[in-house]
Design a protein with these regions (language model features):
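N-terminal cap/lid segment of alpha/beta-hydrolase-fold proteins
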Residues: 37-82
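Short beta-strand element of the alpha/beta-hydrolase
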Residues: 83-92
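The serine-hydrolase catalytic nucleophile loop
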Residues: 94-106, 120
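Conserved alpha/beta-hydrolase
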Residues: 107-127
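Catalytic histidine-centered segment of alpha/beta-hydrolase-like enzymes
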Residues: 333-342
């Protein structure tokens, strides 16, 4: 195993640990069966990055094994010939495919891969009720379902499929790679371990049975009240409406991405909504990274030098086994720099071309 360095600068965290969506204009209804919900998919280019003239793009849908229909953007290089290596992309936690994951996907398509950026279950344009919730099991399955979809595409070589998980979906991606042997290469970029941060708090500051009990009691009180009253308690937004100046730096960095024109999107939970107040319950009791030491295929962890979340990747890297595992630290970068400003695409291209061949 090896640790590499790169160059870059600015920002720091995630808002999706039980703390931290939408609208469309022109839409198309898509339905896969009479038993499935209809998705209203916008057909306009409403993404936070310009459309590439080197890539063909189209909206697609597919179901996971829980019957939830997922919405995705498929990117294919216009110069494509024959069957291609493919990459499924998702995250950050609380973001939509029109934000970071779409930027990763389109750029990797420009570099020769067929790519798929999808909205996780219960968020964005994907289906699932109630809205704005998450699950370590179902969101891991979302990655596995994306692999299902890619294996069935005529221009994809089913033996050359990788994934990119960003932020909270970095941990989900590692969990998917630990169970899905079809995934030949995995990147976790600016990763959060959502189980650990929900159970233990930031930097494990709440890592005690008493602290976890208090969290469980608070969330189960909400469940009881909702059951008795037939209501659904709304969540509290993870980001403030405005920055006052005394917030932790990582909150300022999140705000700079999700709440400004740089990254704001109306369908993003982190930009324009709030997570279910009971969302963290399952994460507390279901450790995502339990079996990552059994991943045989290649893994690349990428994190910013100045990211508050860097310890998630460093600790995960210590548990990975084999010479095909790598940790890349991007100098000067914080957590959200890897959302858009300092993504090491040359390294990503080299990694996937080396391991999807």
């Amino acid at each position: 195993m090896k640790t590499a360095n790169l160059k870059s600068a600015t920002i720091a965290a995630l808002l999706g640990l039980g703390v931290l969506t939408g609208c469309t204009n022109s839409t198309t209804n898509q339905k896969t069966s009479d038993n499935m919900e209809t998705l209203n998919l916008t057909q306009e280019w409403d993404k936070k990055f310009p459309q590439s003239d080197k890539v063909n793009h189209r909206k697609v849908t597919f179901r996971n094994r829980y019957g939830i229909m997922l919405a995705a953007d498929l990117y294919e290089p216009k110069s494509a010939e024959g069957k291609l290596a493919a990459i499924a992309v998702s995250g950050p936690f609380g973001a939509v495919k029109e934000q970071t994951s779409g930027l990763y996907a389109q750029t990797m398509a420009e570099r020769g891969f067929l790519t798929l950026a999808f909205d996780p279950s219960y968020t964005g344009e994907s289906g699932g009720e109630p809205r704005n919730t998450a699950s370590p099991d179902i969101n891991t399955e979302d990655f596995n379902a994306a692999v299902d979809f890619l294996t069935a595409q005529p221009h994809v070589d089913a033996e050359r499929i990788g994934i990119i998980g960003i932020c909270g979906f970095g941990g989900m991606g590692l969990n998917a790679a630990a169970m899905d042997t079809r995934i030949k290469a995995t990147v976790a970029s600016t990763m959060y371990d959502m189980s650990r941060v929900n159970a233990n708090g930031y930097f494990d500051a709440e890592n005690s049975a008493d602290a976890r009990k208090q969290k469980r009691e608070a969330m189960n009180t909400v469940r009881t009240r909702d059951a008795q009253n037939g209501t659904t308690t709304p969540g509290t937004p993870g980001l403030p409406a405005e920055i006052k100046g005394d917030e932790p730096q990582f909150v300022k960095d999140y705000f700079d991405y999700y709440k400004t024109d740089r990254g704001f999107h109306a369908r993003s939970v982190n930009s324009n909504g709030a997570w279910s107040p009971t969302m963290a319950l399952s994460f507390i009791n279901m450790p995502l990274l339990s079996y990552i030491h059994e991943i045989d295929n290649a893994v690349l962890l990428i994190h910013g030098e100045n990211a508050h979340s860097r310890y998630f990747s460093e600790d995960a890297f210590k548990r990975l086994k084999g010479d095909n595992k790598e940790l890349l630290i991007v100098p000067g970068a914080n957590h959200t720099d890897l959302y858009d400003r300092m993504i090491p695409f040359n390294k990503l291209e080299k990694f996937f071309k080396s391991n999807l061949k």
